[in-house]
Regions:
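Short amphipathic, basic-aromatic surface patches that mediate peripheral association
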Residues: 45-53, 167-169
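Sec/Tat signal peptide C-region and signal peptidase I cleavage site
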Residues: 17-21
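Short, surface-exposed beta-strand/beta-hairpin micro-motifs centered on an aromatic residue
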Residues: 90-93, 205-211
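Short acidic/polar inter-strand loop motif in beta-rich domains
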Residues: 51, 108-115, 226-232
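Short, acidic Ser/Thr/Gly-rich low-complexity loop/linker segments typical of extracellular
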Residues: 187-205
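Beta-strand-rich domain onsets/edges
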Residues: 22-41, 116-176, 182-186, 234-257
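Short flexible loop/turn segments that cap and initiate beta-strands
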Residues: 53-63, 170-178
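Mid-chain, structured segments of secreted extracytoplasmic proteins
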Residues: 64-113
Length: 257
């Protein structure tokens, strides 16, 4: 019981971070697919989700889907689009059979002059199809990855979500920062800037937990470092991020009583 209490305390230690976090975005048209041969729209972007400020997203180096242990490249399906008036990408994937579909992209490094560093966010989302829920907890083997410990789709707002951060296949060190934002499509104004980006830290074994206070799409970005890269003849820092998006469903009023 004592070990469990310590792990829980470390995992849910939330603070507010008055900074404007960058997020890789991988947003499906729906978190669930209920019928076969349903086209699923996917949007790939790079932005500040709460502030709804975009940055240009060059075409990713890789874009794949995993289903039943099989990996399929979707890179050639990408078409250029715009998100928040900036370069982004879109794809349509047809779901043909029941399963858990995990989509992920590897971006080209993004140079952020304001922070004098490169940013590389390995971004993924999981979609459930036709009642199947096998395999959502399996790691993909990305250089940086959030592996869900709670099913990452079909969750109520107010339910706890848990995940484990892996860097190069190993649990992230205790205290690894995790930035948390929601997709603020309505551009709602927040009471103060501290609420723009929430922050958690990993506990033992790279684990963390978060309870979404309201429904919608929420993104988690676990941040670490990667080997330096050259920029104009100088070696620069690289922020390596593991990003996971998941949706929380509003609890109907008749169930909330």
């Amino acid at each position: 019981m004592r070990l469990r209490a310590l792990a829980t305390a470390a995992a849910i230690a939330l603070t507010a971070l008055p900074a404007y976090a960058h997020f890789g975005v991988l947003m499906p048209g729906s978190e669930l697919v209920n019928r076969p041969k349903t086209p699923l729209e996917l949007t790939l972007a790079f932005c500040h989700p709460v502030e709804q400020n975009g940055m240009n997203r060059a075409k990713p180096e890789a874009f794949d889907v995993w289903q039943n242990g099989e990996k399929t490249s979707l890179l050639n399906t990408l078409k250029e689009t715009q998100v928040l008036k900036h370069e982004a990408w879109k794809s349509t994937f047809t779901v043909t059979r029941p399963g858990t579909y995990t989509f992920a992209f590897t971006p080209k490094p993004y140079w952020e002059p304001a922070e004098d560093k490169f940013i590389v966010h390995y971004t993924k989302v999981v979609v459930g199809a036709m009642g199947d829920e096998e395999g959502w907890e399996k790691p993909l083997g990305l250089p940086a990855e959030i592996v869900p410990l709670t099913r990452p789709f079909a969750n109520w707002a107010g339910a706890e979500f848990r995940g484990r951060v892996l860097f190069d296949g190993k649990p992230a060190p205790e205290g690894t920062p995790i930035e948390i934002e929601f997709w603020n499509g309505s551009k709602a104004k927040l009471p103060n800037d501290y609420l723009i980006t929430l922050q958690a830290v990993t506990g033992a074994n790279g684990e963390f937990a978060f309870t979404a206070p309201f429904a919608g799409w929420w993104g988690f970005a676990a941040l670490g470092d990667a080997p330096k890269m050259a920029k104009d003849g100088k070696m620069k820092d690289v922020e390596r991020g593991a990003v996971l998006w998941t949706h929380f469903t509003k609890v109907p009023s008749q169930l909330a009583k």
